[in-house]
UniProtKB/Swiss-Prot annotation:
PANTHER family (UniProt xref): BETA-GALACTOSIDE ALPHA-2,6-SIALYLTRANSFERASE, BETA-GALACTOSIDE ALPHA-2,6-SIALYLTRANSFERASE 2
Lumenal-side segments: 32-509
InterPro entries with a match to the protein in the record: Glyco_trans_29 (IPR001675), GT29-like_sf (IPR038578)
Keywords carried by this UniProt record: Disulfide bond, Glycoprotein, Glycosyltransferase, Golgi apparatus, Membrane, Signal-anchor, Transferase, Transmembrane, Transmembrane helix
Region (Disordered): 42-123
Protein name from the UniProt record: Beta-galactoside alpha-2,6-sialyltransferase 2
Broad enzyme group: transferase
Organism classification: Eukaryota, Metazoa, Chordata, Craniata, Vertebrata
Family membership: Belongs to the glycosyltransferase 29 family.
A single BP term in Gene Ontology: protein glycosylation
Subcellular location as annotated: Golgi apparatus, Golgi stack membrane
Protein encoded by which gene: st6gal2
Amino acid sequence: MRFSMRQWRKLVLAAILAWALLFLGLLSYFLDNRVEEPLTPAGSLVSQHSDTRRLTSIQSSQQQQQPVPGLRSEQGLNSIRTSHGNQPEAGVLSSSETPGNMVNHIPSSSPYQTYGSQEANHQNDLDPQSLAAWSSFGTQNVDSNFNIASQHRERASQSIFSNNVEDEELPNEISPLVERRADADNVVQHMWRGTVSSGMLSPRLKRAMNDYINANKHHVSYQRHRKVARSAKELLCQMKNQSQLRTVDGSEQPFSSLGWADFVPLVPLQRWNKQRGGRSFRTCAVVSSAGAILHSGLGKEIDSHDAVLRFNAAPTEGYEQDVGTKTTIRIINSQILANPKHEFKTSSIYKNITLVAWDPAPYTLNLDEWFASPDYDLFGPYVEHRKNHAEQLFYILHPSYLWQLWDLIQSNTQEKIQPNPPSSGFIGILTMMALCDKLHVYEYIPSMRQTDLCHYHENYYDAACTLGAYHPLIYEKNLIRRINLGSEKDLLKKGRVTLPGFSTLTCGA
């Protein structure tokens, strides 16, 4: 009887242990998946798959906003309706429609409505009441609840660097703590090695990517040869030869008939870097807006460059230690001009620097269609700004340049990539390679500080900001990783990529 009681006790203890292990396993699985998904409440104005372009808050809040004042409403730009005899075809948006009305033309099943289609600042486009409600669910408790895995990542990376890991150890022997990261971090590790693919993405991001591919909003049809085994030198020369920097110069319709030749700067962007007594920029810094740049202490290093490129509404004030203070040129997407909440007319971050704007256009480069139905109405605000601030250099990138960059990515990728323009980051990198002798890019490929924090100046978390959904981000970053001339230690510790300027390359035709 005593022997059977002992067996019974062992059985009970074994059952308790089994249940404890099962509970811990389920808890670990639940926490990993919570990190993978962005935390957004039901009814939030943040889109289900907020990627790095359009905010779904536009859909409900912009109808209450005042139209952006600009030349679009004046007689000059309105004359395009009569001078060309072109009324927008059925299904094509009229330029007079507000962004809030634009979404009504997009089928409810469209990924451009579900996931978004422009890079933006997630918080800044919410009204204060909505922002307060959203923050109470989505970001106020991030540090204690949502981003547990990110805290583990930061502690792991701090441990690695405090132990003074040698250069040769970094790329090959990654700490076991880092190896236990979530799926998004495993993708970043493959990004460091240049071996990333869409099969490594989470189901959520793969689904968003496939939806964009199937929607093909810009009617992309790529029939050219793909070669994925180019050497770094071959890839650099392909970039130099096939990505010809170009801006809207007013010489093509519909811009020529509207007198845009009088609005655009006399100095082409291609020669912008020669304005300092004929000297080009020797060193340039491209500073991404990624959350990983926080606590980097890279500010002084960034400011030591001859020219510094920043993106969209990324500020320097309050973040000087990490991002520096100097801004020479800023690339902005069309939402910055069109959405009053970005304060394009009044904010000091857009003043006393060179501005370069861009907006998606059809792959066929139909400029009339683009002018009639831009993703966001940048044309009116652009002309108004040029009239009021003629002394400031301000350009709009030509759609042909954007799609040349997209072709470049697809031609070096065996997989079918998202048929949407590259990110502002990739556009900025290639633009500065055309203007500078040497380039340092910070946190475009994330360092060991990698986090799901989208932008260093916002409290919003989503892996899509690093890995992409709308933009072919993983493929862009794979290309930049392949041409990196810097050390692995610089990449992992600083998030710094070193690239040559096109002017320093010797390439055949």
